[in-house]
């Protein structure tokens, strides 16, 4: 996750986030959907973020990319639902992953860490996100969980 203020963040970082978060999802779906449509079933579970539902300071490009994943997932769901293909979205809140090791804007990283500390320093365990994905996957083909938002109980945003 490449955090930064739109006034000074390198546009190359914007492109990297769009390529990964939006085009990566598009490419992945384009690869797997033809076979799912042909066999009339299958699940696609896309990963987004709560940043795809609300804004966060110093997250402009990241937020834009995750809003894109939300819109893309819902649009494709509408396109393939008649073919019995399930498109689901998981939108985690702050989680303990390596994503923040890529932040190049120290001020943005500091702001994130202050926000995290204001919530007691606790964020979502990645295992909880994985359990959520498995829960969606294990649903019968006749049930499509369109979206799940998941965050640590103490996350205030």
Regions found by a protein language model. Give the residues of each.
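Active-site helix of classical SDR
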Residues: 29, 65
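Short, flexible catalytic-loop segment of classical short-chain dehydrogenase/reductase
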Residues: 92-102
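Substrate-binding pocket helix/loop in short-chain dehydrogenase/reductase
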Residues: 5-6, 10-15
